[in-house]
Each structure stands twice: as structure tokens, then as C-alpha cells.
Regions:
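Membrane-helix boundary/coupling elements in multi-pass transport proteins
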Residues: 81, 104-118, 213, 218, ...
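Extracellular loop-to-transmembrane helix junctions
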Residues: 39-136, 205, 245-255, 422, ...
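Membrane-interface loop-to-helix entry segments
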Residues: 133-191, 242-247, 366-376, 395, ...
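TM-loop-TM module centered on a large, flexible mid-protein loop between adjacent transmembrane helices
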Residues: 87-88, 94, 126, 241-305, ...
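Helix-loop-helix junctions that connect adjacent transmembrane segments
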Residues: 51-55, 129-132, 161-293, 418
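C-terminal membrane-solvent junction of multi-pass transporters and transport-like membrane proteins
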Residues: 158, 327-340, 374-421, 439-450
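Membrane-interface "cap" regions at the ends of multi-pass membrane proteins
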Residues: 1-53, 65-70, 81-82, 191-192, ...
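Helix-loop-helix connectors at the membrane interface of multi-pass transporters/channels
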Residues: 3-7, 87-90, 96, 116-137, ...
Length: 451
């Protein structure tokens, strides 16, 4: 075969991604990634932490995420092929700040499959109590690992079908909840406002503590920024789609938890906090116990599998760049083309961690890292579009500053144990990075390599 000529005409033969994704397509993709049932799994933990007030917490979290989404969308215009908080912060602020952001992302990637395993084990135990919860934890940790070792993954069509099925379940829950509420009339108008504000249990500490957990509902919206090369008018549509996704998920999530709190008030304890939404739904129509429970189990199963392989690929990228020992983390199984060592490594961490962490504490650790990354992106957008820009526009000042300080307040509202555990993780990572880069003088990569 002859050599490829290096002429300008040959360049036209290089395949490029077609820009076919409209604004609506991008928002739909974002909703699929975040899942229409996003707040249901965490409803019990949110209600317990906020003593109710879950609706208000989700709406406040939405305000923080909308500001952060604007920053993500704007940074995607500057770095259209990156889509990573690590890249934004490292390039705009300092490589050491980028490392801190990247290390917080590593914790997120590891904790995500862990909390999915914990939740799946709890729900499976509700369906089959003959096997203890610890047995289900072992089962799901092993199954996630074995399936990922085989390179099994769902197709885009299956994911879209699952999103449609979840949406149908959400509609069914709304119908049953409305029927139940109308069948149990309340003359007290406070009944309908209590999910927003209950004077008997409201404190700012409870509200912001709940809001710091509610951030989980929105984690993943930044995935839209990875579609810049396939989107029509990406400079406009990526930011609009990111903001639109947060808005759609926020309003939908608020509606979902609102009807749940009307049906099952915060003053009434749940039989199982982790599967609280399933019990609230079943109160409106008994078959929903199985319908909602199975839907959430499948959703968390898929999320757990995807999160584990995502974590394994991140560690592979770090191993390939020698940020981690290449001999272990930088290898790929030649048969199934997966980072085998990393999949097993994450599987072991998930299995052990599931016996020491609760679902609620896992959410806090996940948000500990996510909020650091969000603050980093807001800071990067502020530096690029305001500090370094000759034109000091308020539109380039308000969103990143607002997003940064709301995220900071939410991060500070995490529980003390979560902040201690997260800080230990960050301290170990910073010490490792300082040693590995000889005082942050050499680059380290936290980019997830393409499949």
C-alpha cells in the first residue's frame, strides 16, 4: 500500500464527526445521562438530613448547578475537545490547582460505583430478604466486576429505551400520587407548602446540609460538553443544553420529591431510609413497590457498571501517563480491550468500602469531590472570561462568582465526618502528586481516555 499523500486534498479524506446534534438532542442526551428518576434513590437520605425540605434543597442546588453549567458551557467553547474540569483549571489557573481538581474527580469515580452497590444491595434485600444485605453487596460487587471484565456494555438504543421506561414510571408515580392526594383531602393549606417549608423542623443548617446532598441529582450534566464536535453551533448550543438539562432535571426532580413528601411526610419514619421513595410510591398504589423498586434497581445497576468501568478507564489514563504505576494501571486486556487490573482494583475497593460506608455518607463523599471540581470550573471561567478579558462584563462576573460561592457554601455544609474523610483523601493525593511531579513541576493527566 502506498503512502498517504500529505496534500491539502488528502486532508479532506480524514473522517470527521458530523455536526448533527440539535439543541433538543443535546438536552435529551443530558436528561438520559442524569436519568429521569435521579432523586428517587437518594430521597430517604435527603429527607432525613433536611428534616423534610427536600424540594427546597433541590431547587437551591439547581441554582448552584445552573451557574456552574454556564461556566462549563463557556469553558467548552475554549477547550472543545477536552470537557474536563481538570483541563480547565490546569490551563487557566495553575497545574497544581488542576491536580487538586483532578484528584477530587478520582474520588468521585471510585465512590460512584460504591454507592450504587450499596443501594442495589438494599433494594435487592427488600425483594429477597432471605439473602442478607452483606450477601447482596458481595453479589453486586462481583457481578459488576465480572461483566466489566468481559467488556459488556449497553448500547445507545438500550439506554434511550431505559430512559423512556423510566419516564413512563415517573408519569405513573405522578398519576398515582395525585389520585392518592385527592382521595385524602386536606383543608390545611400548610399541608401543600410543608415540603418547601415546615416551621417546626426548619433550620438553615438542616436545609444546607440537605442541599449539599441534593447536588447528587445533577452530577453528570457536564457530559454534554464532550459532544462539542458533534453539535450544531456548539459555541451556543453546548452552554444552552447544559443549562437546559439542569433546569429540566431540577424541576422534574423537585416535582418527584414534592409528591413523595405530600404522601409520606418527613415526620413519619421510613422502614428503610435507602429505599424510602419505593415505600412512598407504594403507599399510593401497592404494585408501585415492585415497579419503582425494580426500575431503580435496574437504573442503579446500569449506573454502577458504567461507573466502575469509568473509574477503571480513568486509572488506566493515569497509568498510561505514568501518573500511577504504569506496570499495573497502564495495561489493557488484549482479548476484551478493558483495563483488567483496574476493573479488579475498583471492584475490591467497592466490595470492602460497601461494608464501611452508608449510602448517605457515600453521597456526601461523592459530592465532596464534585463540589471541589465545580468550584474549580467556576474559578477557571472567572479567570478566563473576566480577569483576563479586556472587557469587564457583569455577565462574565456574576455566574462564575455566584456558582463558586454557592458550591463553597454547600461544600462547607457537608457533615464533619465526610469532610474529614474527604480531606484525608485530598491530603494523601496532594502529597503523592507533590512527590510524583517533584513539586508539581511535571504534568500529571486526569483525562479519561476514549474507548
Amino acid at each position: 500500500m502506498g503512502a498517504i499523500p500529505t496534500t491539502s486534498s488528502a486532508a479532506t479524506l480524514v473522517p470527521r464527526l458530523r455536526r448533527t446534534l440539535t439543541l433538543r438532542d443535546l438536552i435529551l442526551y443530558g436528561v438520559i445521562v442524569l436519568q429521569p428518576v435521579a432523586p428517587m434513590s437518594a430521597f430517604g437520605a435527603l429527607s432525613d438530613r433536611g428534616r423534610g425540605h427536600v424540594v427546597t434543597a433541590i431547587l437551591i442546588a439547581m441554582l448552584a448547578m445552573l451557574s456552574t453549567a454556564i461556566s462549563y458551557g463557556r469553558m467548552a467553547q475554549v477547550y472543545p475537545s477536552a470537557g474536563s474540569a481538570f483541563t480547565y483549571v490546569a490551563q487557566e489557573i495553575h497545574p497544581s490547582a488542576g491536580y487538586i481538581t483532578g484528584w477530587s474527580m478520582v474520588m468521585d469515580y471510585i465512590v460512584n460505583p460504591l454507592i450504587c452497590t450499596i443501594w442495589c444491595a438494599g433494594q435487592a434485600h427488600e425483594f429477597a430478604p432471605g439473602l442478607p444485605v452483606w450477601g447482596w453487596k458481595v453479589f453486586f460487587a462481583v457481578v459488576f466486576t465480572l461483566l466489566n471484565l468481559q467488556g459488556i456494555k449497553t448500547s445507545a438504543r438500550v439506554n434511550a429505551g431505559m430512559a423512556a421506561a423510566m419516564s413512563a414510571v415517573v408519569v405513573l408515580v405522578f398519576v398515582c400520587a395525585i389520585r392518592y392526594i385527592l382521595g385524602h383531602p386536606h383543608n390545611d393549606f400548610g399541608f401543600f407548602t410543608r415540603p418547601f417549608y415546615d416551621p417546626q423542623t426548619f433550620t438553615l443548617g438542616n436545609l444546607f446540609g440537605c442541599t449539599s446532598l441534593a447536588v447528587l441529582t445533577y452530577i453528570g450534566f457536564d457530559a454534554i460538553s464532550t459532544l462539542s464536535e458533534e453539535a450544531e453551533n456548539p459555541k451556543r448550543n453546548i452552554m444552552l443544553a447544559t443549562v437546559g438539562t439542569c433546569l429540566v432535571i431540577g424541576l422534574l426532580s423537585a416535582a418527584e420529591v414534592y409528591v413523595a413528601q405530600l404522601v409520606w411526610p418527613a415526620s413519619r419514619p421510613f422502614p428503610n431510609q435507602d429505599t424510602a421513595y419505593v415505600y412512598a410510591a407504594a403507599l399510593t398504589w401497592a404494585p408501585l413497590f415492585k415497579i419503582v423498586g425494580l426500575t431503580l434497581l435496574i437504573a442503579n445497576f446500569g449506573s454502577g457498571m458504567g461507573a466502575q468501568i469509568g473509574a477503571a478507564r480513568l486509572l488506566y489514563g493515569m497509568g498510561r501517563s505514568n501518573a500511577l504505576p504504569r506496570s499495573f494501571f497502564g495495561k489493557v486486556d488484549p482479548k476484551n480491550h478493558v483495563p483488567r487490573n483496574n476493573v479488579i482494583f475498583i471492584g475490591v475497593i467497592v466490595l470492602i468500602g460497601s461494608f464501611f460506608l452508608t449510602f448517605g455518607r457515600g453521597i456526601e463523599l461523592l459530592n465532596f469531590g464534585a463540589l471541589i471540581a465545580f468550584m474549580g470550573v467556576n474559578a477557571a471561567a472567572f479567570v478566563h472570561y473576566f480577569v483576563r478579558s479586556p472587557q469587564k462584563k457583569l455577565t462574565n462576573f456574576i455566574p462564575p462568582v455566584l456558582g463558586f460561592f454557592i458550591c463553597l457554601a454547600l461544600w462547607w455544609s457537608l457533615s464533619v465526618p465526610a469532610k474529614i474523610l474527604g480531606s484525608i483523601w485530598m491530603a494523601l493525593g496532594i502529597a503523592f502528586g507533590y512527590w510524583k511531579t517533584h513539586g508539581f513541576r511535571e504534568p500529571l493527566s486526569f483525562e479519561v481516555p476514549a474507548e
